[in-house]
Amino acid sequence: MELAPLFNQMPFARLLGIEVTEATEGTATARLEHSDDLLSNPTGEVAHGGATYALADTAGGAAVMSLAGIVTPTIDMRIDYLSPATDDLVADAELVRYGDSVAVVRVEIHDVDGTHVATAHGTYKTSGQGEETPWGEDSEVGDKVPDDLR
């Protein structure tokens, strides 16, 4: 499944301008262009923390889905803001562990000049998304998850 186009069609990601540029083998990269619509106050140049958080969550979800092959809802996301976001952002997500029911992802967010803006840790649901839930049907993960991530 090609995930970048799928994520780029998600209404919330489109609203914010988040673009998933790659999602494969437990990693993902996403970008967010800095704009006045994302500012935390009308007279500043710092993006609202929620925009950075949404970028991290989108990249983290794409990394998990690249192995799961199913929608993987966020259970928990923790973020440490390290520098003000005053430029375009890039999020690099990497799967830390993929278990039978949850996956853990680490996301590093930098601006385009390389300034470390935030670090996030996310937990995503990897099973139980049956037909009766809003997320759709389960699918088999098969052998896609490397042993060192289990």
Question: Residue locations for each model-derived region?
Answer:
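Compact, glycine-rich, soluble single-domain proteins
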Residues: T43-D57, G61-A62, D76
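Catalytic strand-loop segment that frames the active site of acyl-thioester-processing enzymes
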Residues: G17-E45
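Hydrophobic beta-strand-centered segment that forms part of the acyl-chain substrate-binding groove
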Residues: G61-D92
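Short, charged/polar surface micro-motifs in flexible loops or helix N-caps
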Residues: S35-L39, A59-G60, A85
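HotDog/MaoC-like acyl-thioester-processing domains
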Residues: T86, V96-R150
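A generic structural signal for short beta-strands and their flanking turns/coil linkers
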Residues: R14-L16, G26-A28, V71-M77, D87, ...
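N-proximal, solvent-exposed amphipathic alpha-helical segments enriched in charged/polar residues
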Residues: M1-P11
